[in-house]
Curated annotation (Swiss-Prot):
Pfam families: DD_K
Cellular component aspect of the GO annotation: extracellular region
Keyword Secreted: yes
Keyword Secreted: yes
Tissue: Expressed by the skin glands.
This protein's name: Dermaseptin-J5
Similarity comment: family membership: Belongs to the frog skin active peptide (FSAP) family. Dermaseptin subfamily.
Length: 29
């Protein structure tokens, strides 16, 4: 349903944010 889609989108956003944060840290070193 709609709620599961929202939850999946949230998980994807968290994953993307985590990857971006890791990338920023790696690039700043």
């Amino acid at each position: 349903g709609l709620w599961s889609k929202i939850k999946e989108a949230g998980k994807a956003a968290v994953k993307a944010a985590g990857k971006a944060a890791l990338g920023a840290v790696a690039n700043s070193v």
